[in-house]
């Protein structure tokens, strides 16, 4: 089979690494594989194509804020992508996360449908079925059609116009009639349950596939790494704003309450002026093996996000033999191994502190057993095998 993946980035950030793992796995298995990505550094790797330079994506991001249409524009790059697909003639096109202002999603879906192209759509966020925001949180409008958005600046970053209703209609029109040639692949049961409530995607076939990681060379248990009795939080962005969806404010408050525990934060962070002395920022850790060592040294990992469609930190932590404690955020409490993790209602610091202290002092765990169980569940090989099955079913249907 020949598979063509499309993603925002390649070889970096969570979806870029997933795309790379899948690409390499397909090649190792004897399949043909091509990756087209929209943003980020140029990669000198065969069968990997960057669609446009970063300035093009930034320009289209700016235009989308003016027009209020988050997934439109990008006419030249969309035509270029269509030419690549025609030239490569793949058996299956796999759309990963494509909300990076490098392709017109409405036009691309409509074109793939018209071509009767066998297509897999991975749901790494909610925008494919909300047609607007990446996380809808408690809003329910996306189910039947967005009207007046009460959170317009965050939902699609529009500066002037509320065109959420138009975006929703365009996305619904693009997907309508594509059910026979397209399979939707959410990354978690939680995301699948949400997508099935949407008028845009509810009539499609679904196959949930967990995100996979490199459990052979990076994320695994190593008893040679000494435990440092720290609590690790891995995040895309740490902020001390209470309303920030990644929940940094709650971790600051928790660290104040647990002054006898050392907390480490890995990820980009705002300039936090007043922070507890027992909380330390490591910055963004790009080297995955270094990150894995921090997981192994930690006594526990902590998740404080308000909403997640998956949770790579949960998976990475468990594969390194480290239990997970956190807030209920949608997917994490569903995809995490229950016997090695615990989640409490979002925002309840009392319950979070109690749970974390129990895992640090009272619960007896075998970290190698945790890692072995997790590696079987979350390996990249498991993910690759699942997608090969999906591709095969589509290409012969």
Q: Which residue ranges define each predicted feature?
A:
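A short, active-site helix/loop in glycosyltransferases that binds the activated sugar's phosphate group
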Residues: 130-134, 158-205, 213, 217
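Conserved donor-binding/catalytic core segment of Leloir-type glycosyltransferases
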Residues: 183-185, 223-246, 252-256
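Nucleotide-activated donor-binding/catalytic signature segment of Leloir-type glycosyltransferases, i.e.
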Residues: 267-292
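Short alpha-helical donor nucleotide-sugar binding micro-motif in glycosyltransferases
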Residues: 293-298
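Aromatic "clamp/platform" in nucleotide-sugar-dependent glycosyltransferases that forms part
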Residues: 306
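Short hydrophobic beta-strand element within catalytic cores of glycosyltransferases
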Residues: 323-326
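Conserved acidic donor-binding segment of nucleotide-sugar-dependent glycosyltransferases
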Residues: 338-349, 358-364
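A charged, aromatic-enriched C-terminal amphipathic alpha-helix characteristic of glycosyltransferases
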Residues: 364-396
């Amino acid at each position: 089979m020949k598979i063509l993946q499309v993603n925002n980035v390649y070889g970096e950030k969570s979806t870029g690494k997933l795309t790379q793992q899948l690409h390499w796995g397909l090649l190792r298995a004897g399949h043909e594989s091509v990756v087209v990505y929209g943003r980020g550094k140029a990669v000198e790797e065969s069968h990997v194509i960057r669609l446009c330079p970063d300035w093009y994506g930034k320009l289209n991001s700016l235009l989308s804020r003016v027009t209020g249409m988050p997934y439109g524009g990008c006419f030249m790059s969309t035509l270029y992508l269509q030419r690549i697909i025609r030239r490569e003639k793949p058996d299956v096109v796999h759309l990963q996360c494509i909300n990076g202002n490098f392709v017109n999603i409405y036009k691309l879906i409509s074109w793939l449908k018209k071509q009767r192209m066998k297509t897999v759509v991975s749901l790494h966020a909610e925008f494919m079925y909300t047609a607007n925001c990446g996380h809808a949180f408690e809003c329910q409008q996306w189910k039947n059609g967005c009207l007046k958005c009460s959170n317009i600046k965050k939902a699609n970053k529009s500066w002037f116009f509320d065109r959420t209703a138009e975006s929703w209609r365009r996305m619904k029109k693009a997907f309508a009639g594509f059910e026979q040639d397209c399979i939707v692949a959410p990354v978690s049961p939680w995301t699948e349950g949400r997508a099935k409530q949407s008028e845009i995607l509810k009539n499609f076939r679904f196959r949930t596939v967990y995100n996979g990681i490199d459990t052979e060379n990076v994320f695994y248990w190593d008893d040679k790494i000494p435990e440092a009795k720290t609590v690790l939080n891995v995040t895309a962005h740490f902020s001390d704003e209470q309303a920030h969806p990644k929940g940094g404010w709650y971790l600051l408050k928790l660290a104040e309450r647990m002054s006898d525990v050392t907390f480490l934060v890995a990820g980009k962070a705002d300039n936090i002026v007043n922070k507890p002395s027992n909380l330390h920022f490591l910055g963004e850790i790009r080297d995955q093996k270094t990150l894995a060592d921090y997981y192994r040294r930690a006594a526990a990992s902590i998740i404080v996000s308000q909403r997640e469609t998956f949770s790579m930190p949960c998976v990475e932590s468990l594969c390194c033999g480290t239990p997970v404690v956190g807030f209920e955020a949608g997917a994490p409490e569903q995809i995490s191994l229950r016997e090695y993790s615990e989640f409490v209602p979002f925002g309840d610091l009392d319950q979070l502190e109690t749970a974390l202290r129990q895992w640090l002092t009272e619960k007896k765990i075998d970290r190698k057993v945790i890692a072995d169980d997790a590696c079987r569940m979350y390996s990249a090989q498991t993910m690759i095998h699942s997608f090969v099955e999906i591709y095969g079913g589509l290409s012969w249907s």
